[in-house]
């Protein structure tokens, strides 16, 4: 039995043909689709494709997903596995933390962690200099490796989106005087930098798990 897939669009366009950009077996058989797919596969990619609007890094971590989630959902874990965020202290606002990003010459960074235990998602909402608009959002999903790789552990998927504010500081009055850099200056390095940090996370979580230590250390409890 054929389902009425895309019937509403056909009615709206007044034609049974596909809309622009749609590639499905009904209208693009394999001999047509294969060259399209091959064109999408390159040994060398343009710079703006690699460092465009999205930056994603992934890795396998030999650590139970629930224990890794508990660790990542505590904002203070960033003190351990990030390259440059240090000195997390609570603010007067609930769940909002203040730290310093040493990439920006002791720049203040504000962070609120938003998480969902059922979905195993942990999102860090951050901003340099000011706490009122946390526009830098680090999206992390933990996947049970038993489901996707058929082995114990976790798969971590981490994505950042290129918010327009990376290109210019929307709140220049809150910046420290004479600061030579803006966080967006590092966008082209996000992929490598975040992979470095993900390797840090992997090393820390696996060491604790392999050696019988709590993945979330006692100082965070």
Which residue stretches match the model-derived regions?
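Hydrophobic ligand-binding cavity/cleft-lining segments
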Residues: 2-93
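Amphipathic alpha-helical segments that line or abut small-molecule/effector binding pockets
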Residues: 66-69, 195, 199
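C-terminal and inter-domain tail/linker signature
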Residues: 67, 78, 95-97, 104, ...
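Glycine-rich portal/gate segments that line the openings of hydrophobic small-molecule binding cavities
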Residues: 79-83, 89-137, 149-151, 156, ...
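Short, highly charged C-terminal tails/helix-capping segments
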Residues: 196-221
């Amino acid at each position: 039995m054929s389902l009425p897939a895309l019937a509403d669009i056909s009615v709206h366009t007044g034609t049974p043909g596909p809309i622009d950009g749609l590639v499905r077996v009904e209208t693009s058989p394999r001999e047509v689709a294969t060259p399209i797919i091959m064109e999408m596969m390159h040994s060398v990619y343009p710079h703006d494709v690699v460092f465009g609007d999205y930056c994603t890094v992934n890795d396998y971590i030999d650590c139970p997903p629930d224990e890794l989630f508990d660790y990542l959902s505590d904002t203070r874990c960033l003190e351990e596995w990030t390259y440059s965020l240090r000195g997390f202290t609570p603010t007067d606002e609930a769940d909002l933390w203040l730290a310093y990003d040493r990439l920006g010459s002791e720049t203040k960074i504000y962070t609120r962690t938003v998480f969902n235990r059922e979905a195993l998602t942990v999102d860090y909402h951050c901003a340099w200099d000011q706490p009122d608009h946390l526009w830098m959002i680090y999206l992390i999903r933990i996947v049970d490796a038993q489901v996707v790789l058929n082995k114990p552990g976790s798969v971590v998927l981490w994505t950042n989106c290129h918010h327009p504010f990376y290109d210019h500081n929307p709140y220049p009055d809150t910046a420290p005087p004479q600061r030579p850099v803006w966080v967006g200056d590092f966008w082209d390095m996000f992929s490598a930098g975040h992979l470095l940090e993900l390797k840090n996370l992997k090393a820390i979580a696996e060491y604790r798990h392999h050696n019988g230590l709590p993945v979330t250390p006692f100082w965070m409890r």
